[in-house]
Amino acid sequence: MHEAQSAAAVGIAMKMEQHREAWRVALAGALCLAVAMGIGRFAFTPLLPMMLHDGVIDLTAGGWLATANYLGYFIGALLCMVLRGSATRFIRIGLAATVLLTLGMGLWQSPGLWLVLRTLAGIASACTFVFASGWCLQRLAQLQAPALGGIIYCGPGLGILLTGLATSAMVSHHWKASYGWLSYALLALLLTAIVWRTFAGPAVSLTPAAAASPQALPPAQIVRQTRGLTTAYALAGFGYIITATFLPVIARQALPGSSWPDLFWPLFGISVSLGAWLATHLPGHWDNRLLLAACYLLQATGILIGVASPSVFGFALGSILLGLPFTAITLFAMRDARRLRGDQARSLMGLLTATYGIGQIVGPPLATRLVQGSGNFTSSLCVAAFTLAAGAGLLGLMYRESRQAQA
């Protein structure tokens, strides 16, 4: 009797320790993505109006800086498909690089050098994102806590929220954009120090019970589903990026003299984190493709609301609808990659991230070209909304094909 009670107590203690470790991994993943994505990629968005105000760049140059970052993101995603070695080592390198490259944006006032720094920052962001996503999701699977995967993707929203609120305060105190970059480098350093020890070694080998196996599908169907998923994910990259790059600029153009434009980007960040958290509470048996299609339609609706009603209410509601599905889209896409490839999904995750990057590369220069022709962002935003709707339609067709194959 005593031995049975002791064994039960040990089992409870092990479960509690496993639960704590799972939360530590999930939160570390969130902070890691806050650095890589929220700061490394998206701190540029709220700082862009400050850079325009300082006269260090114009809108066209800002579009090219954004494109350079997305080109780097694409290159980094391709690298992830061929890089071999410890995921945690690449995560640490990516975090350290993000800190240094963000610091460089504040130290050197050279648009030509900024193009190089933003390109390298994109590479670091992609590598950190892919390796951190893969490592954390695998570790959570080992700890039998895959439902916490959505917590990881709260990180970008957290970073966007912090940088958005901080930038709003900087604007009110008439800071230069360079001070903003230096401040965000310090913030990235602090967050990196917090998670550094978590990414100290490789994930332990999966037990057979914990390993993820690809769904039993005919090879031809797996190929078609993979192609469809990568195409749809590329459309998502193009569809969101125009608004995500230029939201503060668009809002300032529509609401001149108002203080509200500084708050739409933090609202977007809150919505990103909330959406990622809500995604963890959806039933696990819901189909990822249908969830992705719903997310695409939400984002398209948010964009069109901003076009139809360029007011405080319209931009606020649009920011919420654009942000809620933002990283949920990534979570559902990465989960579908694991459905198709199981624990060998890292290369597919890299491919998805690369195609997403292609969409992002095309978006900003197209937007600035359309703005030069029309004087506003309406046409580029309508193109973005149409692209998201097309992606939702493709995902719906993929789901119908798989259902018909199972019938």
Residue ranges of predicted features:
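A late C-terminal transmembrane helix in Major Facilitator Superfamily
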Residues: D343-N376, A384
